[in-house]
Each structure stands twice: as C-alpha cells, then as structure tokens.
C-alpha cells in the first residue's frame, strides 16, 4: 500500500511501501524503508537502509542512508548521501555524496556537486558529474565531468572531461589503463596511465606530473613541466606539445610543434612535417620532420634523421 507522511515519523523497524509520499520527515538510526513503486519525497529521509525496487522516486529534498539500494529510477533536484549499497538503475540528483563501499553498475548523475570519499566500483557503471571531488577510489566504466572536478584519490575509468579537471592523485594502472578525452581544461599534477589520450582542438592538457599513454591524439595544447611517454599517435597541425621530458616508443606523426625542454628519447619512427625542438636527447629510431632544432646535445645511434632544416 501507499505510505503517506505529512508529519514526523520515527522508524526503527521496517516500512514496506508500494509508493511513498513524504512531505515532512522520516528518521530512525536502525530503520529500513523499502519502496516498490516510487513516489515523491519533498521532505527529509534518514534511515539505516533505504531500498527502491521499482518505479520512479522523485526526490527534491534529502535522503540519507547508511545503506542505499536502487534498482529503479531516482530523479529530482534533491540530495542523496549514502555510505554503502548498490545501484543497478538510474540515479539523478543535484548532489550525491558517497562515504563508503558502494557498487554502481547503473548510472549516477550529479547535476550540481558530487563527493566521494569511499570506494565506488562496478562493471558497467557510469558517473556523470558536474562539479565534484574524489578523495577515495573510483573504478567505473565511464566518468563524465562538465564542471570543476578534483581527484586526490584513485580513478580507473574512461574519462571524458568537458570542464576543468585537476588530478592530484592517480588515474589508471598498468593493469587497468584509463582512456581520456579532454574537451575542456585538464591538469595532471601526479600520475596518469592511459591506453589513449585525445586532446581536442583549442583545449589544454597541462601535465606537471607523469603521463604514460599507449597512444595520443593531440589537436590542442599539451604543456607543462612534466614527463610524457608516448607509445604512438599524432600531434596534428593545430597541436602543440611542450614537456620537460618526452619519450617516444611507438610510431608517431608530428605535424605540429613538439618541444622537449630537458630530455628527449626516440626509439620509433617519427614522421610528418612538424617542428621538433630538443634540448638534450638520443635517437635510435628514425626522425623525419620539417624542422629540427637542437639546443644542447642530440646523440643519434643507429637511426636516421631527416629534416627540411636542422639548427644546432
């Protein structure tokens, strides 16, 4: 049956509701609220366990649960705070806070602010975030950001950034590499291990840490005083790459500007009509460029270097 609350309910037992209409408060540290066919919440809900098993629950105020389980649809402009639980459905809220071990195999969308200090995992899971932060761990298929997002924890996911993303933690591992598409501003101050990085035209990827990627497609600006190791890819005519240290391990087409301010190492084939600027470095592969400038010392061992002009 439907559960309608317009007053104040303290529940430390179990409420099974076909649908919920709550305009006031439902509290109880040990209580369980189970909703089988959605409803509306314009009040406050604070329970030990909240489970939504069917229908659509529209939450325009707040739900706080030690364990929050959803296999249906949560919509609205409210706030959701959970410590543990699982989501296999769709959750859309203005604000989402996760404080513990949470399994997401569905989709969680946070339109205003997302905060994770716990461990979010789940195959097939998708996080869509406007503004937010992660100080815990995120292991998901996809993380999409559109506002300001900071990571001080660990992330394993394919990341699409349309806002301002700052990484002060770790993204990807050798066993679980990330795929990053930057359509905004991306700053890495620590570690990124990626299978692929795409930096869009007129967008900026600043690396002051360490980036290792199997392949990169750079149509914008990749700058900073960090180190990058590239397994292959392309720097287009609109692309600019400037790093302290650059290592090329796979075939790479440079048609833009690429500068290594400290050290440069190439063991593959670099092709294209771009400009390559090197301080100190070594080449055991093949380099063909429009222009090569060496400010320090370049050691060529068993490789070939060809350019329209070479300045030393």
Which ranges hold each PLM region?
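Extracellular beta-strand-rich, repetitive "passenger/adhesive" scaffolds
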Residues: 1-312
